[in-house]
Amino acid sequence: MSDSEQTGEQAAKRTGQLETCQRCGRKQGLVGKYDIWLCRQCFREVARGMGFKKYS
């Protein structure tokens, strides 16, 4: 078992996080608000297409 797999399993046990990004499968940095379940990187790429607006 590699270190990255072990870290992912340990993170799931520690946080109770069972979801993964629906786009790329990443387990960390998830945006779960509104049941989106995208990692933060994927969310940044598709947020405008989903109707989110960026305010500065």
UniProtKB/Swiss-Prot annotation:
One protein family per Pfam: Ribosomal_S14
Sequence positions that bind Zn(2+): 21, 24, 39, 42
Cofactor comment: Binds 1 zinc ion per subunit.
UniProt entry keywords in alphabetical sequence: Metal-binding, Ribonucleoprotein, Ribosomal protein, RNA-binding, rRNA-binding, Zinc
Protein name: Small ribosomal subunit protein uS14A
Keyword Zinc in annotation: yes
Keyword check for Ribonucleoprotein: yes
Family: Belongs to the universal ribosomal protein uS14 family. Zinc-binding uS14 subfamily.
Annotated signal peptide: none
Name of encoding gene: rps14a
